[in-house]
Amino acid sequence: MKYFLAAILVSVFSSISLAQGEDSTKYERDEMIISEFLPGIYSNYNQVYFNNRGKVPDEERHLRREIEVQEIETNIFSVKDTFVMANIFEKPITEDDKKTSHAIINVEANNKDKAVQLDIYKSDESYSLNDIDGSPDCTVMMIRGAEEFYARESSGDCDGMTNVYTLSKKHLFVRMDKDSGINTKEPYKLNEARPFQCYVDIPGVSGGRDLPYKRYEPFYIHDQGGTFEILTDHEKRNLVFRLVRVDWEINNHIGVFTRDVMVLYAEERTDEGYKINGYTFTEPDITRVGINFKWMLVSCFMESNKFATPFM
């Protein structure tokens, strides 16, 4: 009898084992995660700030860089890669100050080579899928780490491309070009940015000034150094506002661990130079922040009060 039961159990478990025909490979699963992580706006504002604060030699400093990734089709993404060649503290940033390239990334599990393959193709702002008919300009093989994916190897002519180094839910690191002219192998460290909308009221609440009220809006920026400027109607003041989610690379006092913050700066261009009127800081993951100086109020938010759900 016990042999009969054993035979039945073997038969049942064998059937269960053989029934797993829908299992994917782990690289096919990783392909889905990478395709979920990739879209977004990324900026290395934080890296540039701490290069300056840490007095990194000029020849080793990274340029300001922003990368925008959007899904075109399943597993196919457009890449707008922009270097900002001017300093926001010296002049307003214009399109002439930007050097932009375009690419298309195709994401595909490579079970044979045990990785997720990123094929990167040069493109233009039209992002025509005809650009990916031939061989890729650069190929990066991504494998999974503890909390991120990293490039095991790359091939092709990857200089001048968005040569992905690591990718997580919160960041995109890009390998330094060999002919960049910058004397460092440290990658470009771009943090994912969140979109915000802002407005400015002049005067602000309890302003106490005899000026006609005006709201300047809307302005769309992000929280990785996103900036907008206004010229006020009556006093002709050139006000600048900047939103930064600070990812501290250092501690700002000996013996303490400095926690990340969200900072909203209120600044101004004057005949005497660039000045900071003030700033506020709070927890890094908040979705709205504001300052009221009375003579001026600025508010930035991810969701407008126009669309907020009423509550008690």
Label every model-predicted segment.
Residues D23, Y27-I34, P39-S78:
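Short, solvent-exposed loop/hinge segments that bridge or flank secondary-structure elements
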Residues F4-F13:
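Sec-dependent N-terminal signal peptides
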Residues S17-G21:
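Boundary at the C-terminal end of the N-terminal hydrophobic targeting segment
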Residues E31-P39, Y45-N52, D81-M312:
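Calycin-type beta-barrel ligand-binding domains and close structural analogs
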